[in-house]
Swiss-Prot record:
The gene is psaA. Keywords: 4Fe-4S, Chlorophyll, Chloroplast, Chromophore, Electron transport, Iron, Iron-sulfur, Magnesium, Membrane, Metal-binding, Oxidoreductase, Photosynthesis, Photosystem I, Plastid, Thylakoid, Transmembrane, Transmembrane helix, Transport. It comes from the Eukaryota. [4Fe-4S] cluster binds at residues 573, 582. The keyword Transport applies. This is Photosystem I P700 chlorophyll a apoprotein A1. It comes from Lobularia maritima (Sweet alyssum). GO terms for biological process: photosynthesis.
Length: 750
């Protein structure tokens, strides 16, 4: 840590009334660009309008103005999020069976949408139990509401109204901080203050307030609910907060107040701040007392972290010093210059944030099923499948976004003149070695992982099961994964002596937890089948990384096109008269990377869906016999390609294909429609611009003949636009098809 003399007092960091509020200007399409504001000559205008409306770099080169626009847009985004949340809570209050579900969550399904009868679509209102007819929801909101202590629809109404107020407040803030008091560039670049406030405020105080809410409101209410008390009889949240005796009845140490805290006798609080591990056998979720303890601990960590960086007081860390001190044996100048990059290029900053947030989202996907945080979440199979799938897709998109903005940084913000021998420069100088090695890894993984399957298909086809790679013939056990599982299963009593069970039942060792005759979670066995599919995961992830990383490292120049930086972020080819240079722009790498991301995530969610139905989810008899949904067929069926097609895709598609005439029929229609959207994408991906321009010319001729030709000249989509429309429909169609396939299946059998 470096101690410096105190910095001078902070200057005024906002400009007052920098930009007047003008509805006339906003009403003019394309007001942000001189060219677009002139109005349309050809139909390309509408595409440019959409492409550039939020590309603030193209409106101005002034970093301060760009920063203000981004900052203001963030408030608009928050406003939309609050509006969406309000809608969710309003549906829970107005159209749902939340109170009925709360009284019997094992026999009643969650529903918060009732279809109006107009042309007979009231068939979609299925019987979710308890005499309620509606669409079964799979968002997990009911489980979150119960965990947070919401016991009535009135409370949901109040929260919905509160969220609307916050949405309005955010809209106002977005306007205020752009038009009335806009921060100066120095404010956006003050990273130490930003770290202190975000760490201590958002993460520290945010976690502390949630921990407080859990201890004072959620825990007592959930205690009553678990004991079978009628929600209407449970005291209201404010009564627990105002009346300490109420809490002391449930947790006797409450009667001592804060004395144990100040006398360091903290173990007194272990009634409601526990360290148990495992799942609550009543609800099948993590112990809420463990969760409260966790948030308190997280709050302490982040409150400390939020006091580590040097601001007005001249003590603490400076980010620039930390980065410049970071030198390794092979990294030359190390991280020198990174501080300047990250405070002047928001694309570089965004790229890092997207990569980390995307990875974190995928981590969330894996924890939601292995450590289900909310009561009755683990036995709601449709919600479990939806949450996993949703977080996997989101994580995949965020990581591709990270590569996109890294490439935009390389093209627009990277200045090679003052970058010499730092980490980034050294990576760029040996990019050929990086990419060619990564390419070799992809080829190796592809041939070997796929080869194992092809071997099995061949042996199976020739009737030689004894020569297949399987748990019953030639075993390829995932020994490292099994070792990790075993280590975690043994942790309680050894490395974590206070714990009564391991972090997740999936590690093994523990008993299974069942709620209402359904399996919540049990130890997940790993075998040859998992070994095979995990190497497909490795393959698809490495190919995605290869495409995206090549796009970033060759964004400015390559042997093929040395002056690529001058062509910009997206361009179709290197001009006329230079063949073989199409699909080389940084944008095209993002475009191609999206397809492999889709590949990678698809295999993951298919693996998860089948594995859970085969080895985890199912019912348990009074004698303790578990019957899994697909009867444990994963280990023997998923070791051939044919098995995936026959026993997963085809066998489990029967519910969506046969859904017509039932309450699941909407999924049947979506399955059909989304296939159509996906197929529609191929029209854009497999045909060239000239074909369409030729067609358009003859259609225009017909319009002229009939004297109905428009003033705006029709143009075919540009090559890049066609690819953008193609990949959008490809992903939308593919994801919606999977959604319909998964939900019709799991709602029917789960």
């Amino acid at each position: 840590m470096i101690i410096r003399s105190p910095e001078p007092e902070v200057k005024i960091l906002v400009d007052r009334d920098p930009i007047k509020t003008s509805f006339e200007e906003w009403a003019k399409p394309g007001h942000f660009s001189r060219t677009i504001a002139k109005g349309p000559d050809t139909t390309t205008w509408i595409w440019n309008l959409h492409a550039d409306a939020h590309d603030f770099d193209s409106h101005t080169s002034d970093l301060e103005e760009i920063s203000r626009k981004v900052f203001s847009a963030h408030f608009g985004q928050l406003s939309i999020i609050f509006l969406w949340l309000s809608g969710m809570y309003f549906h829970g209050a107005r159209f749902s069976n939340y109170e009925a579900w709360l009284s019997d969550p094992t026999h009643i399904g969650p529903s918060a949408q009732v279809v109006w009868p107009i042309v007979g679509q009231e068939i979609l209102n299925g019987d979710v139990g308890g005499g309620f007819r509606g669409i079964q929801i799979t968002s997990g909101f009911f489980q979150i509401w119960r965990a947070s202590g919401i016991t009535s629809e009135l409370q949901l109404y109040c929260t919905a109204i509160g969220a609307l107020v916050f949405a309005a407040l955010m809209l106002f803030a977005g306007w205020f901080h752009y038009h009335k008091a806009a921060p100066k560039l120095a404010w956006f670049q003050d990273v130490e203050s930003m770290l202190n406030h975000h760490l201590a405020g958002l993460l520290g105080l945010g976690s502390l307030s949630w921990a407080g809410h859990q201890v004072h409101v959620s825990l007592p209410i959930n205690q009553f609910l678990n004991a079978g008390v009628d929600p209407k009889e449970i005291p209201l949240p404010h009564e627990f907060i105002l009346n300490r005796d109420l809490l002391a009845q449930l947790y006797p140490s409450f009667s001592e107040g804060a004395t144990p805290f100040f006398t360091l006798n903290w173990s007194k609080y272990s009634e409601f701040l526990t360290f148990r591990g495992g799942l609550d056998p009543v609800t099948g979720g993590l112990w809420l007392t463990d969760i409260a303890h966790h948030h308190l601990a997280i709050a302490i960590l982040f409150l400390i972290a939020g006091h580590m960086y040097r601001t007005n007081w001249g003590i603490g860390h400076g980010l620039k010093d930390i980065l410049e001190a970071h030198k390794g044996p092979f990294t030359g100048q190390g991280h020198k210059g990174l501080y300047e990059i990250l405070t002047t290029s928001w694309h570089a900053q965004l790229s890092l944030n997207l990569a980390m947030l995307g990875s974190l989202t995928i981590v969330v996907a894996h924890h939601m099923y292995s450590m289900p945080p909310y009561p009755y979440l683990a036995t709601d199979y449709a919600t479990q499948l939806s949450l996993f799938t949703h977080h996997m897709w989101i994580g995949g998109f965020l990581i591709v976004g990270a590569a996109a903005h890294a490439a935009i940084f390389m093209v627009r913000d990277y200045d090679p003149t003052n970058r010499y021998n730092d980490l980034l420069d050294r990576v760029l100088r040996h990019r050929d070695a990086i990419i060619s090695h990564l390419n070799w890894v992809c080829i190796f993984l592809g041939f070997h992982s796929f080869g194992l399957y092809i071997h099995n298909d061949t042996m199976s086809a020739l009737g030689r099961p004894q020569d297949m790679f399987s748990d019953t013939a030639i075993q390829l056990q995932p020994v490292f994964a099994q070792w990790i599982q075993n280590t975690h299963a043994l942790a309680p009593g050894v490395t974590a002596p206070g714990e009564t069970a391991s972090t997740s039942l999936t590690w093994g060792g523990g008993e299974l937890v069942a709620v209402g005759g359904k399996v919540a979670l049990l130890p997940i066995p790993l075998g040859t089948a998992d070994f095979l599919v995990h190497h497909i995961h490795a393959f698809t992830i490495h190919v995605t990384v290869l495409i995206l990383l090549k796009g970033v490292l060759f964004a400015r120049s390559s042997r093929l096109i040395p002056d690529k930086a001058n062509l910009g972020f997206r361009f179709p080819c290197d001009g006329p008269g230079r063949g073989g240079t199409c699909q080389v722009s940084a944008w095209d790498h993002v475009f191609l990377g999206l397809f492999w991301m889709y590949n990678a995530i698809s295999v993951v969610i298919f693996h998860f869906s089948w594995k859970m139905q085969s080895d985890v989810w199912g019912s348990i008899s009074d004698q303790g016999v578990v019957t899994h949904i697909t009867g444990g067929n994963f280990a023997q069926s998923s070791i051939t390609i044919n098995g995936w097609l026959r026993d997963f895709l085809w066998a489990q598609a029967s519910q969506v294909i046969q859904s017509y005439g039932s309450s699941l029929s909407a999924y049947g229609l979506f399955f059909l429609g989304a296939h159509f959207v996906w197929a529609f994408s191929l029209m854009f991906l497999f045909s060239g611009r000239g074909y369409w321009q030729e067609l358009i010319e003859s259609i225009v001729w017909a319009h002229n003949k009939l004297k109905v030709a428009p003033a705006t000249q029709p143009r075919a989509l540009s090559i890049v636009q066609g690819r953008a429309v193609g990949v959008t429909h490809y992903l939308l169609g593919g994801i919606a098809t999977t959604w319909a396939f998964f939900l019709a299946r799991i709602i029917a059998v789960g």
